[in-house]
């Protein structure tokens, strides 16, 4: 549309207005000429005067941007409202802009000479001052749009297109910067100069929007490539036919698809295809052949997968570097994986070093790996017996249903006729387990020479078995002459008692005791409720004696001699030593509480009684006061007479059958345990 309509700043908003009059005003600065405009606000018919610096050219993009911001604000307001004057003014301006756009599209054919004439703008000299930073974005946009427009307008021949594209690509930055500064100055200072530019604006915006959308999609693809480390295929970078015809000719598109297919084929898995070095060389050869057939400029623009016309050749170099970097990373990962395998298996790592040092020594392969098979008869395992450390043993037999095995320890006088030990399979460890070295070091603390001899014997057996010089079980190997060079190292007199022993001379006496103790210990015994019941009954007696002080009068009468006591008479006539004292209370806390109370009662004793007992406080409290207090409390709590209460006290706590059996078995076990060392001597 013509330049008589502008966007002016009024009431802190940009209002569309019609220019009525323009007047220039002199300024103090010689370089700047300010002008004031008399405008009329659309849909309001209100005339105002504004400065030219506060106005902008009325364009479709500016109006749509303002309306979109108002739409966002209206979404926040939930309540319905009427259309404001500002919104009506913007809608009117948008309709006027659209009508002007239709007119400009009809006159595009007449504007083509004007667009092509922009090529002849002279280049900016190299010593020209740099542009401002805020102008860089517009200059880049204008540069891309102008280059694509030049390419789309010249449809006569393929050769002319290529030459025109690259000449404009080389001289475009300086020309577009100059044009951008001129256009920017015109838009900000003088709206009247926008009459001619408005007609070109819609055409440029269409092309710029298409270019920007393609550029944004390609930038996202390039970032995705860097993150995922692969070259995208041609299908990922295709554009619809309508846009591709307006942007680039058909020949470069074909070349780009071919080059992208080549790069995609080169990015196959290195494990399935050729080696990494061949992969890179194969990619370079394919790329060079494409460049020789089509041309350096076209192949560069096509293989990069980008739809910009003037693209630097360093993009192809970066793709080659990306391939080489991926190959190096794959090699490093394979090296790390092999290093981890060697670190997890130290035996295999040591074997590989030995193979490199001495090629003549060829050990069997199966001794370098951990055993993964199940337990079998004749297998060598680790077994811990009683107080001894883990020791190499041989499985004599296995009971699969019970999951138990009979094992025999490896020792100097080993014989298959000896009786083994039956143990659970869970207590056994494979000989080549991961803890093998730790088990050997633990056994060396007390049996250094013996465990070294066992390890050498087992190693010799497995080497001969792997080389084929011997076939048979470990027991057969130990009894054969082939094992004599290893067996002769051990002298029976020297190593008689430094091997773990499964049995000794008292094996016949130990087995019945062990079985009986196991039978008693593994019985499922329910908790005994008789003792807690007795403790609760005794708690009532303690409360009666200590808290209620129900026996205090009876005890004070005995201390002062007013009451006769059978226990006092026996105390005075007794000998100096008393073998046993019946306490009746089984809980020590209850007994301590009663004794402390009786000691307080003892302080009230008279001098005559103190002389009779010879001032023996502890013995008098335990043998006289304690029985009298318990009997008196039983009589009062249970409702018995003194004789019946005394008989219950003398009988003691009533033990159950289970308590008696446990007590008797404990006494017998302690007695037999003490008798065994005496028989050994």
Swiss-Prot record:
List the Pfam families hit by this protein, alphabetically.
MUM1-like_PWWP (PF20884), PWP3A-B_C (PF20886), PWP3A-B_N (PF20887)
Compositional bias (Polar residues): 102-121, 285-302
Region Disordered: list its residue ranges: 102-144, 166-200, 285-304
Phosphoserine modified-residue sites: 128
List each copy of the PWWP domain by range.
Answer: 377-438
The answer on whether this UniProt entry bears the keyword Ribonucleoprotein reads: no
Question: What domain of life is recorded for the organism?
Answer: Eukaryota
Q: Hey, which family's this protein in?
A: Belongs to the PWWP3A family.
- The protein depicted here goes by the name PWWP domain-containing DNA repair factor 3B
The species this protein was found in: Mus musculus (Mouse)
Protein's gene: Pwwp3b
